């Protein structure tokens, strides 16, 4: 989809090498953000972070070629067998989202970032009197109530 982009196998190898390198040290299973392209690595890293937050989890990119690559990467990561916290298993990756950007063909950055399980979020409204209303996970009301 991007003129001058690296071949799909280069992107696959880069992402899989990054996942294998960190193994379970990043509190897997993770959500993986991947960005390809951009005008500098800082931009590409931010784009990868943005990809992590796409909702809903595992929604695919609107470009069918990118969506197909997201699916291939997701499957390939889980086939590495790293598993939760690196002890082995089928679930290393809970989700993978990819973003792309144009860039000069002489420089083509690829960024991979991980969203650790402990960084997952919930939206809540905390009232002055101390009441907590969980917006994204209403079932947490029971956890708070029984402390």
Give the residues covered by each predicted segment.
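Non-transmembrane, aqueous-exposed alpha-helical and coiled segments at domain scale
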Residues: 1-147
